Amino acid sequence: MLCAIYKSKKKLGSYLYVANREDFSSVPSVLLEHFGKPELVMMFNLLGRKALYNVDCNEVLETIKRQGFYLQIAKQDDGLFNSLSEIK
């Protein structure tokens, strides 16, 4: 499965993974507001042999299947995205 990976210009080290390029329909609008305009980093095959940095491909794949997107945040994040369930 290919996914599109976007980085945040507002939140250093934050990445948003979606199943289809430019399709943010499953991402809550409040999350997108905090994330800022997504900047495409790359298309990535989650079922391929290459690994992602600091995140498990299977976890990303399952989360995209379940909720339509995956949010990767920097470990030193200030807590803005930590309660994603409240944003939905």
Swiss-Prot record:
Where does the record place the YcgL domain? 1-85
Q: Name one Pfam family in it.
A: YcgL
Q: What protein name is recorded for this chain?
A: YcgL domain-containing protein CGSHiGG_01115
* Organism of origin: Haemophilus influenzae (strain PittGG)
